[in-house]
């Protein structure tokens, strides 16, 4: 829940950048994640968490920017990269200046690129990307940019801690890595190989 207190503070701090959103009666956040298809459960749970936290931790405590309420607007990206960018544009066209997404680092990479280009071309309609769970390290390394704000630890940080625990288990001799065939899975595999080699003599067999 501390996450959403940070979001509220962030909205307050960044209000200077967004003239149109500041003067609106309600500060809106577009939640762009899967709400249909095989990943709908993940997106629906995330949406419920955002709505609950915004209502309980922000609106019921007086709102932001001098008492303005916050609202989460749900947009279904169907867990598809192209559809995600369509929904980002839908949000922008509706005057929404805060984009929240977290399921799929591949999609997050596409959104951060779009937001960067949009803000360069539209300095009077700048958008901030609130990345709440896409943990590809590239998003805050090679692709680090001012308009992308990540709340979660990246895959390198998480794997560093996980391999500390693994290193303490003397009975583990071999390990097989299974992961997704896109940016997130590849980042996790690379971090696992790196830290296991540094901390253990475990053989990675696949």
Model region roles, listed by residue range:
Residues 1-11:
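Bacterial N-terminal signal peptides that target proteins for export
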Residues 12-17:
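Hydrophobic core
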Residues 18-24:
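Sec/Tat signal peptide C-region and signal peptidase I cleavage site
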Residues 24-30:
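Cleaved targeting-peptide boundary
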Residues 30-53, 75-82, 103-104, 178-187:
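Extracytoplasmic "Venus flytrap"
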Residues 48-72, 197-201:
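Signal peptide-proximal N-terminal region
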Residues 74, 78-97, 114-117, 164-168:
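Short, well-structured alpha-helical segments in soluble
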Residues 97-206:
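Extracytoplasmic ligand/sensor domains, especially the bilobed periplasmic-binding protein
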């Amino acid at each position: 829940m501390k996450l959403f207190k940070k979001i509220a503070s962030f909205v307050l701090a960044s209000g200077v950048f967004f003239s149109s959103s500041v003067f609106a009666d309600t500060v809106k956040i577009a939640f762009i994640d899967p709400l249909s298809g095989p990943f709908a459960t993940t997106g629906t749970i995330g949406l419920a968490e955002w709505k609950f936290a915004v209502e309980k931790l922000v609106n019921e405590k007086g709102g932001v920017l001098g008492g303005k309420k916050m609202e989460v607007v749900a947009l279904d990206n169907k867990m598809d990269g192209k559809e995600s960018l369509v929904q980002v544009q839908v949000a922008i066209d509706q005057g929404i200046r805060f984009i929240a997404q977290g399921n799929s680092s591949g999609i997050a990479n596409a959104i951060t690129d779009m937001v960067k280009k949009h803000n360069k071309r539209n300095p009077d309609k700048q958008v901030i990307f609130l990345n709440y769970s896409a943990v590809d390290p590239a998003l805050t390394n090679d692709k680090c940019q001012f308009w992308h704000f990540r709340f979660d630890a990246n895959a390198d940080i998480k794997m560093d801690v996980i391999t500390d625990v693994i290193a303490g288990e003397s009975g583990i001799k071999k390990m097989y890595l299974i992961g997704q065939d896109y940016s997130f899975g590849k980042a996790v595999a690379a971090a696992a190989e790196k830290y296991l080699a540094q901390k253990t003599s475990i053989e990675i067999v696949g």
